[in-house]
């Protein structure tokens, strides 16, 4: 193991390294950052560390060869590598949407937009709604929920008449919480992920239109095993005229890009 890529984000630390010709990807809570570094030092005392991310300066790597890679550069290089490896390269220039604790939007190696809506909202507000702090459990609850019991839908407004717009659209996020007594924590989590997805998509779609592309690549730790969020992005493709691409290891794009960067 000669090079180790580390992406130290707001909530998670992602690690990428190659050993015996195989790439290994690991994810840890930022609270365990010091433990992770000690483990890596023991695992490969002669490796060079290629670090990126907003919390990279907190890494205690004194005495080791350390190279700091600009976060945007690492993310773009890692994404390009994964698109080729997974054979998902779009046919034209693409918008890159990185959904981590917050969300950043890139085009041609430039950050052109962003929002505080992302994984931090999912886990933070999710815990307030459900008293559950586990990301995995929150996603599982969302899978079991029915967001139409929490969200006021267009069809709820036009019950006895023809709707002028698609009746399956959201009229008001969480607009039915006080109206439907059967509304559950699972339903609220499903509604929360819908809100996050719709908000990110509206911003991303506007950014895509501004640079005249219909190709949007979604990456980031918040998409990991998060089928409900992916479904939001897939659902509106035809209606809003864009193509969504997801990467199996997109949550590690920054760590991979850092490892590969010279």
UniProtKB/Swiss-Prot annotation:
It catalyses: (R)-pantothenate + ATP = (R)-4'-phosphopantothenate + ADP + H(+). InterPro entries: ATPase_NBD (IPR043129), Type_II_PanK (IPR004567), Type_II_PanK_bac (IPR011602). The keyword Ion transport does not apply. Pfam families: Fumble (PF03630). One of its GO terms (molecular function) is ATP binding. Pathway: Cofactor biosynthesis; coenzyme A biosynthesis; CoA from (R)-pantothenate: step 1/5. It is found in: Cytoplasm. SUPFAM superfamilies: Actin-like ATPase domain. One of its GO terms (biological process) is coenzyme A biosynthetic process. GO terms for cellular component: cytosol. Its EC number is 2.7.1.33. The active site is at 71 (proton acceptor). Its main location: cytoplasm. The keyword Nucleotide-binding applies. Keywords: ATP-binding, Coenzyme A biosynthesis, Cytoplasm, Kinase, Nucleotide-binding, Transferase. ATP binds at residues 7-14, 101, 119-123, 135. Homodimer. Belongs to the type II pantothenate kinase family. Catalyzes the phosphorylation of pantothenate (Pan), the first step in CoA biosynthesis. HAMAP family: Pantothen_kinase_2 (MF_01273). This is Type II pantothenate kinase. It comes from Oceanobacillus iheyensis (strain DSM 14371 / CIP 107618 / JCM 11309 / KCTC 3954 / HTE831).
